[in-house]
From Swiss-Prot:
GO terms for molecular function: rRNA binding; structural constituent of ribosome. One of the primary rRNA binding proteins, it binds directly to 16S rRNA where it nucleates assembly of the body of the 30S subunit. Belongs to the universal ribosomal protein uS4 family. PROSITE patterns: RIBOSOMAL_S4 (PS00632), S4 (PS50889). Part of the 30S ribosomal subunit. Contacts protein S5. The interaction surface between S4 and S5 is involved in control of translational fidelity. The gene is rpsD. This is Small ribosomal subunit protein uS4. The lineage of its organism: Bacteria, Pseudomonadati, Pseudomonadota, Gammaproteobacteria, Pseudomonadales. It comes from the Bacteria. Residues 96-156 form the S4 RNA-binding domain. One of its GO terms (biological process) is translation. One of its GO terms (cellular component) is small ribosomal subunit. InterPro entries: Ribosomal_uS4, Ribosomal_uS4_bac-type, Ribosomal_uS4_CS, Ribosomal_uS4_N, S4_RNA-bd, S4_RNA-bd_sf. Keywords: Ribonucleoprotein, Ribosomal protein, RNA-binding, rRNA-binding.
Length: 206
């Protein structure tokens, strides 16, 4: 399955919530009309079955983190093998992705922009260039912008947007040096309450 490159608002409208896929001066408010579904009959949002509700939740989380179907299934299998709550393990695996950590630190305005920075070899982990967006960041890892990319305007704009919305507590960032430390894996209570990971567990348990 190829990565979706169409209108970002269409995905948010389909899920009925802002997936924060877009950036810009209006980053602190929803830029999409999420009250109606996409298409000419968008106002008619039908009632979902139990399976449909579970599937929509999986698709929502997958799109928030920008993960393909096969990747997401792999994360679920890994989460189910670990001790503790499978749903919480799943979210933590997604949060530890390098593209997500770059976004959380404020170096990219969106996760998609963060993936692009990584693919263009603008990101280092512990001093080594890493160009794999799915790379799993570990506690204590230092994530930084490479020297040659530090003066990019989009990085300065992303840091400004991050300062407006507030940076998460599990990363520590030096905005002058454009580097940060992944201090801890976030607990479930630190993450969005808009995600119901139990629905995803129920879906995969069928």
């Amino acid at each position: 399955m190829a990565r979706y490159i169409g209108p970002k608002c269409k995905l948010s409208r389909r899920e009925g919530t802002d997936l924060f896929l877009k950036s810009g001066s209006r980053a602190l408010e929803s830029k999409c009309n999420v009250e109606s579904a996409p298409g000419i009959h968008g106002q008619r949002r039908g009632r979902l079955s139990e399976y449909g509700t579970q599937l929509r939740e999986k698709q929502k989380v997958r799109r928030i983190y920008g993960v393909l179907e096969r990747q997401f299934s792999g994360y679920y299998k890994e989460a189910s093998r670990r001790k503790g709550s499978t749903g919480e393990n799943l979210l933590q695996l997604l949060e530890c992705r390098l593209d997500n950590v770059v976004y959380r630190m404020g170096f990219g305005a969106t996760r998609a922009e963060s993936r692009q920075l990584i693919s263009h070899k603008a990101i280092t982990v512990n001093g080594q260039t890493v160009n794999i967006p799915s790379y799993q960041v570990k506690v204590g890892d230092v994530v930084a912008i490479r020297e040659k990319a530090k003066n990019q305007l989009r990085i300065a704009q992303a840091l400004e947007l991050c300062a407006q919305r507030g940076r998460v507590e599990w990363v520590e960032v030096d905005t002058e040096k454009k580097s940060g430390v992944f201090k801890s894996v976030p607990a479930r209570s630190d993450l969005s309450a808009d995600i119901n990971e139990n629905l995803i567990v129920e879906l995969y348990s069928k």
